[in-house]
């Protein structure tokens, strides 16, 4: 990412947002240029490898600082997941050497049609927009905007051309903007002179570069007004009307009266709605929830956007209970027929949670999982639905692992995307966070490397570290967070190692908070081992990590998994650092690591895996000549000889302890091989 600076210069390699190696623009072929937007040039491009069309908005930046600020503010938008929001597909900064200009590039979904084309076509034909179609797509827009406002995200650039049509009955909000870009006064003033139509959708306060959720409400009100009046008002008249409303809202009354005279469908709803949306003072405007209430509860609007059916009349509990008395198949049928009623979904899932394992169709009943995931998607903002659905998925997974340990949990993009959306919709809900982390940890360990990469690209590593740091007082968050972190690291494919530099210090804080917690120590040792293999522990952190690993072994020597991972981590660090080796053998308050090795061997002497990892640590310690006398005086030579005599199989002599199971072993010294200054 670009660093701060005030002078124009060509960015060096790596100073950009996510993108492919090399110059990001090189993978696109420019087809043609659209009308320029308020902030820059819009290019229709084709990705050369896939032949997929995109729109790239190129925003010229005066300096690196401006570009990096805008990029940093826009990056979180890449993680949005909603059926009616078209998120940016890529963000990057590029340099145009021909004109010596720096550009922030925003790659978006390409579509031929938007609300703008629909309005213009009806305006030319002087025809009314179909009421059923308008209710449907307006419901989708309201749902998307409610989702954004729920996350405290402001669109800032709502207008008909930024609501694209994916199909005749499916629309998406597009081109979300940032505060940095939308408060560039010079750029806005230039564009306003070129095209006064563009600023006509903006709220009065937005003209002074003050944006809030209420400014989105004004813009949406202008869009609804244009859609309802396009059959009798031309484009210039409509633009002047929008501008006049900023000073004299009374001009709206005449238009509403004309709408009534022209018998515009749903005019009564719009007469109630639009004056409340188009108040000059933003504090007097209604919220997006109020808009939904007026149109879909008090009004008679209907939409395929089922989340709006939260406002429907509830199904009596007695009827629901009667319908849910059958087997799994009949319960799923009820869930599908009443998909828009969250109370029905809750009762159905609670009924499924009580059913015995033999009735659930284990190991993983695909149809049941699909229905539960769909329910989570449809009711993503209903916390009780999310909690119950995750509980049911964990219940199914737990039962499956008990009765069918060889079974793999189904995991596809729909499932992971839904789980991530749940985290995003309810960022402060700890019980949900813990369950989602647990589900993702289990599925990640059973899936391919691509899933781990997908989750990392979605920002899950940073999410885990943020919550480990902010939720130290929550044991469940720490335990589930460490478990998921281990699962993400297990494949050894790390998209960005930089965030992992914080992990040793975070784990140190976790272990200090829970000094006698064996489960926490076990999870921590697993993460330390994988970090050591990945080279993600800095040299200045070696002593701290070695001390924590030894401390964990002393705490829970009876936990074989903890002991194995701790000795693997120690061996990995000692292999590359004499400082780490000295930390193992030095005498400290709890005793030396060498005495601990003896204790571990005696306790687990019949466990080949533990003995192998202990022996591997001894081999690496023996590679340092200055440590040899201490090893000999501590009878380590005799211990190593005993290990070699008792375990002559290849299990002990190979180096598989330093690889993920199933992957080829690394080049670690084999037990029994002569190393520099070894015990041989």
From Swiss-Prot:
Q: Can you say what this protein is called?
A: Serine/threonine kinase-like domain-containing protein STKLD1
Annotated binding of ATP, by residue: 34-42, 57
Instruction: List residues traversing the bilayer.
Output: none
- Give the family from UniProt: Belongs to the protein kinase superfamily. Ser/Thr protein kinase family. STKL subfamily.
Q: Where is this region: Disordered?
A: 1-25, 658-680
Query: Which superkingdom does the taxonomy of this entry point to?
Result: Eukaryota
A Pfam family cross-referenced in the UniProt record is: Pkinase
Which organism does this record belong to?
A: Homo sapiens
At the highest ranks, the source species' classification is: Eukaryota, Metazoa, Chordata, Craniata, Vertebrata
Q: Where is the Protein kinase domain?
A: 28-297
| UniProtKB keywords | ATP-binding, Nucleotide-binding
Gene coding for it: STKLD1
Q: Name one GO molecular function term.
A: protein serine/threonine kinase activity
Specify the effect of residue 139 to D.
In a glioblastoma multiforme sample; somatic mutation
Its domain description in UniProt is: The protein kinase domain is predicted to be catalytically inactive.
